[in-house]
Amino acid sequence: MANQAATAPEAAKASRTPTLALAGLSTAVLLASLGTSISNVALPTLAQTFDATFQQVQWIVLAYLLAITTLVVSVGRLGDMVGKRRLLISGLVVFTTASVACGLAENLSSLIAARVIQGLGAAIMMVMGIALVAEALPKERTGSAMGLLGTMSAVGTALGPTLGGALISSFGWPFIYFINAPLGLMAIGLLYHSLPKDIRSPLSARSSFDFRGTLLLAAMLATYSLAMTSGGSNFDFVSLGLLAASAAFLGIFVWTETKVSSPLINPAVFRTPGLSVGFLMSAMVTTVVMATLVVGPFYLSQALGLDTAQVGLVMSCGPLVAALSGIPAGKFVDRYGADNVLMAGHVTAAAGCVGMASAPLYLGIAGYVAPLAIITAGYAVFQAANNTVIMSGVSPDRKGVISGMLNLSRNLGLITGASAMGALFILGKSLTAATSGAAVIASNGMQLTFWVATVLILASVGLARRARTNLPNHGPDRV
């Protein structure tokens, strides 16, 4: 944990207008999250506009997600070097400009290219948002602020389809991107006037940027992400080849990082139990949450017989609960301590998974919504606590890269969950006799998926308890 001397620079950098700073940071996180979800509803319209297939227009979404996933660690390191405030404002400028370019795109290729640039800006906004909460706000408000950022992320996810549909029907598809411009300009103004100036380190103390490590990490993450998304739940030789390439890039990356004087990721990070366990728990719990998003629609339609509109309405309960849970979760962290709340989040999510796996079909929608709400609330509590534990134990000059790794662990959990949990659902269905009926088959797939999800949560609990035992001060050592 930090000692008093170590925290002095952070206290000196705290914003004099923390409320405005938090408003700007929250808007940045909201925009990045909105950018992920608002395009989905436009895909049919865009396919018709550009005379493209679904496989072609889905790259409008994938390009954005891949840009974020491959760049989050690199932009975190860059923020530590050039200044987090400076980089965040630059990221907002990039995101806002790229959003306008998306709306002006005259063909699919131009739109996808603009989405890649927009994803770069979003990666900066996500990473620097978390890093600056832990640095620019008073320590006693960190938990609440982390909870608020979680809420804004959930609001962006939930709001995207509804807002996107309204904008498309009223003004046309370009306005799902143009809407980012005024919000982006507002966030830039708030952050420019509220965040403290970056404290520039002496020139001799600044590290050079690890371009080789950055390229290797990006290649590893890109090939892994493509392997997990290109084949869906069915792995083929292309997916296996991409996984092999990803493993090769990972090996070269690890070897390279031990040889350079200023590595992108300091190998000491993985020797710090509190950090490595925190990243792993984040990936594991997010994998479980992704199961509700991937498997849920199939269960609702195949087992409960809901139509598309009804499925969408039921699925919106998850983001709604997450939005309502984020701020209270942060306050619990500030009041009861991150370690205790972390365990409570695990227990809550595990209880929801057990409920989802054991709910009988005759309970209908209620048998799905109630466990979904419990899982989502548990995740919100877990996320606020885990983010606080990780970021409060990191020295100021490493907050950017650690925030990037935290975002990366979450994204990898989402990507892995989409493929692995979908495969489990299909496996569960295949183990059921075809004569059982569609509802029973889908229900059995759901049960297998969430019993495995329960095991994942319990494994994460074991990691948390082990880390707690190894760290008497209940937090990662500063790195």
Model-found features: residue ranges?
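Interfacial loop-to-helix junctions that mark the boundaries of transmembrane helices
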Residues: Q56, S109-I117, G172-I179, S207-D210, ...
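Alpha-helical transmembrane bundle and helix-membrane interface signal
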Residues: P138-K139, P196-S204, L226-S239
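Transmembrane-helix bundle of Major Facilitator Superfamily
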Residues: A2-S194, S325-N340, A344-A350, V354-L361, ...
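Residue-level signal for the membrane-embedded core of alpha-helical transmembrane segments
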Residues: T70, I124, A219-A222, A291, ...
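C-terminal membrane-cytosol helix-exit motif in multi-pass small-molecule transporters
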Residues: A181-R200, A218-S230, A245-V260, S460-R468
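12-transmembrane solute porter fold
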Residues: P18-L34, S39-V41, F54, L185, ...
